[in-house]
From Swiss-Prot:
Originating organism: Sus scrofa (Pig)
Gene field: PLCZ
Any single GO CC term annotated in Swiss-Prot or TrEMBL for this entry: nucleus
Upper taxonomic lineage: Eukaryota, Metazoa, Chordata, Craniata, Vertebrata
Name the record gives this protein: 1-phosphatidylinositol 4,5-bisphosphate phosphodiesterase zeta-1
Compositional bias ranges of the Acidic residues kind: 321-336
InterPro entries associated with the record: C2_dom (IPR000008), C2_domain_sf (IPR035892), EF-hand-dom_pair (IPR011992), PI-PLC_fam (IPR001192), PLC-like_Pdiesterase_TIM-brl (IPR017946), PLC_EF-hand-like (IPR015359), PLipase_C_PInositol-sp_X_dom (IPR000909), PLipase_C_Pinositol-sp_Y (IPR001711)
Amino acid sequence: MENKWFLSMVRDDFKGGKINLEKAQKLLEKLDIQCNTIHVKCIFKDNDRLKQGRITIEEFRTIYRIIAHREEIIEIFNAYPENRKILFERNLIDFLTQEQYSLDINRSIVYEIIQKYEPIEEVKQAHQMSFEGFTRDMGSSECLLFNNECGSVYQDMTHPLSDYFISSSHNTYLISDQIMGPSNLWGYVSALVKGCRCLEIDCWDGSQNEPVVYHGYTLTSKLLFKTVIQAIHKYAFITSDYPVVLSLENHCSLSQQEVMADNLQSVFGDALLSDVLDDCPDRLPSPEALKFKILVRNKKIGTLKETHERKGFDKHGQVQECEEEEEAEQEEEENEVRDSEILDILQDDLEKEELKRGVGIKFFKKKKVKIATALSDLVIYTKVEKFRSFHYSRLYQQFNETNSIGETQARKLSKLRASEFILHTRKFITRIYPKATRADSSNFNPQEFWNIGCQMVALNFQTPGLPMDLQNGKFLENGNSGYILKPHFLRDGKSIFNPNKAPINSNPITLTIRLISGIQLPPSYHSSSNKADTLVIIEIFGVPNDQMKQQTRVIKKNAFSPRWNETFTFIIQVPELALIRFVVENQGLITGNEFLGQYTLPVLCMNKGYRRVPLFSKMGESLEPASLFIYVWYIR
């Protein structure tokens, strides 16, 4: 039956005799078989017996079977048909419930699967599935590792903003380094398309009274502020309906601040939040309440009540001024941290505050800040406030005030004062940004700050690598909306949680992964054919006690279909914060291993059963059909 179907599908293509590589590739596409061009070329060459660059129908059949009829899939299929040839509906139901742990499977669902994936018409009409249909089903999105339920907005979006992790970028306008790299609108467009919800805009005075965006005091190129926000307006809600926060680094004169305010209002119109919501005058609203809204994050002078009372009045020429303790220049950050070590000897925050004022240690410098009223009044729920101490915040910080903390200081606080840090992030939105010495736009590991509930962990989206893999993997959850509801123990004021200590009343999971095989993995960059010495590393990222990794053996000279059949077990204490990362490498003897591909996702967003792990490049691009084939099981 399958032979008859195959010949009916390809016979016409061989009427003129043999076919070349290009036609063979098109014929594989016609048969719904995804192929990596390099692998197809090598397999074609190996099966072209006369080495003329053209193959017969029998040679093509061999190529098709090599690519489409994988041994590990044949073994699974053969365990279920009563005659080892055809799956009846009841056989498919057994497979889906026993192996794939699919809930609520019935004949109607099975019928839909057969209709979708079975290519042989007479088998389809009989409500049955051949191996051809089974292998297409196993290679489909239905069998991906990522749970489709996590791929939609499934979380409660009515909590206050502070209850969510918010996808955030740093120096969004840059697409390279921070010294000479170009500023580009693509930085904003790309971040928004990826679901980023907090964008950074460095604003400086430009010529002809037009503010510009660039990395100040460097050779990076400049963009007009108005052009930037026009691009943001166009792409803000393509991927997600939930609010976008514009984090302004404002270095503009008063006159150009007014231009910024005018631009924001004219470009965004009603989408720009310029007053408190009626039901949230004294508390943070929810992402749901702020759908399709743009929020401005900047310094603000005066109260929300005063802002409300000025609404509708012309504010041009009006200036607000205050004296505030401003953070020292970025290059002084390390000195500040060393000075703060003296204060860590004291246990009481109030004593530290008094010491700062009474002892000659200069932590902050006083500065008069002037802000155009027109711009200040556009800041509603995301006012920037200098972080002084947890004690100060508990006493004086207002619900609409947010903090920015550099990675060095934040890391120190997260290690020494984790419980207090969590208490802080339960109430106040906290943004963590890379230290100034990262001139190459490198990133820190964001996991340590998610562990303590920091909402806006800002990364350089333009820089690929492990941190961005974790970022992209984490925000796959909840429909790539850019907002993920924090676990209850990071929201609940009564919960006692410290990521650096053994969790109390945790609900750990035991995760078992059988890494079966690789499918058309990217060949080594150094290979002249389609070969690689492949290995897979499985890593867990989460609280410190959950950080672990395990590795397969190396399969020599096989990137097309390596078989490992190795089983790994992980006990994860805090799965709510855990990410799992699969990394495929080519073993290197001298210069270290070569990265071939990776995939990262939240542990609790994994499907059980036989699953396909899609692989992505270092730049985050899909490497389809390259993937891993695994079996997943976990219990709590």
